[in-house]
């Protein structure tokens, strides 16, 4: 019989999601003493189900008999009986329809497999079956002992066994990444990675405490997406905590925006495509963006890019300096087309947000601490008009000579002495810039350099030299400078000794001039 000729050449080849090496067979009828199937050493376990046995002629199975694990919903199956022509014709029909997906084709084939029966063989970790007769076999990926959770199960595989074969799985899993955007408040310029991908979405940024930080989550759908009838897709987001367990970011659910291949997706009253979860979470997550069934979005396909953008406010729990404030995500996804609810997840991906501090020491000309001063620090924010200066809250450290301003990022600043020490001259506003360099694309981005420089004009980078910022520890992210006040000059007052001296000196000079004048006239008269 030649009913399975096209099943061999089209259906079974198309359905396979495992590539298997098959030696070229000589023409003619073969039965053989049996062949083996070997499992890869990948932590997975495979059950082998025998559907048909028979002989091979010209690369096709003939004289088909029901196998050990066969069934037929329309009649009783007895191992070794001839397979009815109607069954073979049904299989050939589905193989000829190229519009059928792999899952649809498998739905027809699995009608003839009794999964309640004991598999003819189970193999794992490089093991091989014993000699199996020529026939059609279904291979089921049933279990995994992998500690790597970024793993998936293969769909059922159907194979004509007419040689020794080794299973070579081609499993597809999604990819995921997290990014952050870095915007300079004072210039309005967004950092771009010009050396790599020319993207504004990078792995590190710096922000002021109180700023809204823009984040991006991205997931790419796996290549075997069409083999699933239901597909779970969940972004898990975890924010760094301080020593008391409080988050350094405040997530803003109302800023969440979802796109699929660049097109925004919005929940409606009748269709809720995703859920923003902030309660009832596990594993220390702060929130989740859950697509319980991605199939609800009809435009999604294998390779689709799902992007979630949101803002979170950097709060007063933030870590100052090189340690930074980490924000981590991973993607949970369906990983077994034959078992709903089975999921894997991608490795964690982390971005870091840095913030810094300036410390102002009030001193006299001899660098001794000087009490009696008060300072206001402001930052310049560019907007659609001419920009504006916004005050920065001083840290209450209990000192009257050391002024700390924490939670700063790069930009233009103005330091104003609002009260000067008694007996000392006041100083004018001091303008300075903070500049920082951090790794833009890295699995563990770090702070490279941090400096602050006084400027002679507001919001320019022209350097002056009246104050100098230093950092005693490059890791702590603190920039320190001394601001010096000098005592006022002593000026003469009316009625004081200074006035008397002036009078005496004046009289002496007048008398002296008169004597010289008289003497000169007499000398001229004598001539």
Task: Indicate where each model-derived feature is located.
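Solvent-exposed loop/turn and edge beta-strand elements of beta-rich ligand-binding domains
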Residues: 2-527
